[in-house]
């Protein structure tokens, strides 16, 4: 059974990703927002998007524009639109299996400068989120939520690791209560999601990441912003080092 705080956490993440679009590029930005929610696992494979009326309000668009965007993503294989009482737009996208060849292709498509920029952006906003959260004096329910996200990640089956890793990292930003910071962290994660999905998962690296995740949480719960920043920096630099190794 889901807990009330789980629902609040999921709702916060949806609000972070499915934010209003600009009128001039409503269709394109709607596709971008929905694709971000899908690729980040905010709406996992097999689950359905929120109801059409709710989505249109969240995104600040007409239902006609929303339907066009959903149709485009359905045609591209990301969604399965079902009619009827139990219908809706169901996520069919499943991240591809990690592959070093795919990793090189993703990096080539991004370009060296864009890759460096994306990694720098992620480091800045995730370090900032951890620092802010460490100074916030988390209430008991929020401490429990952070610990539960860590526990879920530690117990994740390999095929669900990236999605729960994303949920853990985004939870840190969302728990700060800053919509702008949470949005920035979601954007940063989106820029490297294909990259992270393509990195082969090595058990030694996953074990090391688990230690680093624990260090991040420990520093946050101890109210140690400098320690939180150092822990996030070490963790993200480790990911960058692994990336360089597979590209060498």
Q: What are the language-model segments listed below?
A:
Residues 1-124, 131, 248:
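Short linear motifs at protein or domain termini
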Residues 118-198, 209-215, 227-237:
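Conserved amphipathic alpha-helical segments that form helical-bundle/coiled-coil interaction surfaces
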Residues 25, 159, 204-207:
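Short helix-capping and inter-helix turn/linker motifs at the boundaries of alpha-helical repeat units
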Residues 237-248:
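Short, charge-rich amphipathic alpha-helical segments embedded
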């Amino acid at each position: 059974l889901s807990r009330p705080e789980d629902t609040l956490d999921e709702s916060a993440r949806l609000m972070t990703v499915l934010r209003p679009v600009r009128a001039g590029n409503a269709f394109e930005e709607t596709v971008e927002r929905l694709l971000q929610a899908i690729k980040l696992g905010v709406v996992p494979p097999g689950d359905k998007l929120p109801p059409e009326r709710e989505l249109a309000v969240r995104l600040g668009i007409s239902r006609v524009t929303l339907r066009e965007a959903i149709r485009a993503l359905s045609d591209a294989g990301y969604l399965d639109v079902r009619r009827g009482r139990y219908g809706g737009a169901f996520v069919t996208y499943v991240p591809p299996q990690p592959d070093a060849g795919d990793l090189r292709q993703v990096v080539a498509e991004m370009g060296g400068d864009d890759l460096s920029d994306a990694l720098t952006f992620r480091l800045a906003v995730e370090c900032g989120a951890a620092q802010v959260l460490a100074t916030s004096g988390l209430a008991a329910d929020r401490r429990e939520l952070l610990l539960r996200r860590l526990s879920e990640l530690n117990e994740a089956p390999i095929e669900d690791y990236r999605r729960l890793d994303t949920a853990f990292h985004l939870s840190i930003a969302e728990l700060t209560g800053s919509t702008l910071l949470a949005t920035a962290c979601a954007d940063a994660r989106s820029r490297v999601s294909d990259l992270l999905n393509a990195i082969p998962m090595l058990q030694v690296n996953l074990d090391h990441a688990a230690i680093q995740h624990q260090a991040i949480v420990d520093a946050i719960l101890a109210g140690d912003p400098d320690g939180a920043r150092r822990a996030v920096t070490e963790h993200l630099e480790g990911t960058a080092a692994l990336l360089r190794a597979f590209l060498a």
